[in-house]
Amino acid sequence: MSQLLDKETLKKMIRENVKTLYRKTLEAASAEEVYQAAVFAVRDVITDKWMKTHDEYYEKDVKVVYYLSMEFLMGRFFGNSLINLEMYDEVKEVLEELGIDYNMVEDAEPDPGLGNGGLGRLAACFLDSLSTLQLPAYGCGIRYHYGIFEQKIENGYQVEAPDNWLENGDPWGIKRNEYAVEVKFGGNVRAVPKGNGEYRFVQENYQSVIAVPYDYPVIGYGNNTVNTLRLWEARAKNKLDLKFFNEGNYQKAAEEELLASTMTDVLYPADEHIQGKELRLRQQYFFISATVQRVVERFKKHHTNFHELPDKVAFQLNDTHPTVAVAELMRVLVDENDVPWDDAWEITRKVCAYTNHTIMAEALEKWPMELFSRLLPRIYQIVEEINRRYCLELQAKYGMDHEKLRRMAIIADGQIRIPDKAIAE
C-alpha cells in the first residue's frame, strides 16, 4: 500500500469517517456511506501529492495548459483514482477484510453529470494523459448540478428526469471561495477618455453573478503528479432581496439567485427558443470569463510584462463553445490592464489554440447579433473590431470579392460565426 497509508490505518480511518460523517458504526452504514468514508480516507494521500504538485508548479513558475471545455466526461472518480495511485488491490482487500463488498462501494458513487459524449470523453482523456505525462495542466469547465438527464424507460418509452448526481454530497470537489470572481452580463459600455485620443471602456448597468470554483484532483498513473479539474459554479451576488421579501414578493426576492442557479444547472439546455439560446451563451461566457480573469490574476503574481504571458499560459479551446475566450482575454488585457490593442492581439494569438471536432453545420455555432450584443456588449465591440481588421486582411489578400468576404467574415448576415472567430485569431 501507499507509504503514507498502511492497511490498518486505512481501516481505522474508514471506521472513524463513518462515525464522524454519519453517527453510525461501520456495520450499520450503507454502501453509499462507506463509499464516502473511504473517499475521505484515500483523499489524504491524494491531497498530499496534490499540494506538492502545485507548490512545485508555483515555485518553478512553469507554463500551464488550461484545457477549456463545456464538458468533461470523467466517469467515476473512486476506482480510477485508486488505479492511478496503484492502491486498487490494497483498498479492495481492506474493504473485504472489513466485511464489505468492494463492488457495492464502487457502484455507490454517482457518475458525475459533467459530460455527454465524445467531446467530454476526449477532454477527460487529455487531462488523464497530461497528469500521467507530468505536464502542468488545468481542466476548466462548469460544475453542472444535473448534467444532461437520467434516462428511465416507462412502457417502452424514454422518460427524462434530472440527474441529481450531487444529491448525497460531493467528496471529491473542494470549494475555493478565495478564488471567486465576478462575471458581468448586459448593460452598456461607456468610453472614458484617457488622453492622447485614447479611451478606456467601462461596462455599466450590468447584471452579474459570482463564479465560485470547485477543484477536483486528476491523478497521474504511477507518479506523484496531481493536476486539477476546476469547475465553476454560479452564485448570486445578492442571494435575497430583503425589500421584496418583506413586501411578500418572495419570487422577486429570490430572482437573482434563481438566475444564477439556472446558469449551472444543465449541460446543453434546449435552444429551440431564444431563452435557451441566451442561457447557452451565458453558460459559455460565464466559465470562460471566470477562467481568464483568474489565470491573468495568477500570472500577475509573478510577472509585470504581459508579453511573457504566452511563455506561461496556453488556452486550449475544445471545440466552438469556449472560443469567446479570444475576445475575453483581449478585454482583460486592454480594458483592465491597459495593454495596447496590437500588443494584446499578438499575445492573445500566441496564448489561444483551437481544435474543431466536426464540420457539421448544426455543430458550427452562430449567435444572433442582437442577442450577443445585448448580453455581452463589450465582448461584441471587441469581436466587431477583430472582424473589421480581419476583413481588411482578407481584402488585401483576395481583393474586393464581396461574396468571398461575406463567407469568410466573422460577422455577416446578422450572425456571429463562432468557428470563423476562432480561426481568425
Language-model regions, residue ranges each:
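A conserved ligand/cofactor-binding region detector
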Residues: 1-425
